[in-house]
Amino acid sequence: MSYYGNGGYNPYGAYGNVPPPVYGTPGLAPPTVHVHTDGGHHHGHHHHHHSFLHELGHALTGHHHHHHGHHFGHHHHHHHGHH
């Protein structure tokens, strides 16, 4: 019986364990959600995609952040102008 009850941790533990390894840092998890909510709909989709790569690259590698940062700024400006 104990095993069954303990099994409940399976889904919970897996869920909490998935974000850290994927993002690299637990602190990156909250920002992703915030961006999606703050982004909205049209802007949120594009921003979310860049944010994910930007955050992921920053966590995995620092130099990648610089490259994406420049690209992100350019895209953001273009998107803003179009809007």
Curated annotation (Swiss-Prot):
Entry keyword set: Stress response
Segments for region (Disordered): 62-83
Knockout consequences: RNAi-mediated knockdown results in partial sensitivity to Cu(2+) ions with only 60% of animals reaching adulthood 4 days after egg laying.
GO terms (BP aspect): response to stress; stress response to copper ion
Coiled-coil segments: none
Family matches, as InterPro entries: Kreg-1
Triggers of expression: By heavy metal stress conditions, in response to Cu(2+).
Transmembrane segments: none
Keyword Transport assigned: no
Keyword Metal-binding: no
Domain of life (superkingdom): Eukaryota
Tissue: Weakly expressed in the intestine, but expression is up-regulated in response to Cu(2+).
Function: Plays a role in the stress response to heavy metals such as copper, probably in a fos-1/kgb-1-dependent manner.
UniProt-recorded name of the protein: Protein kreg-1
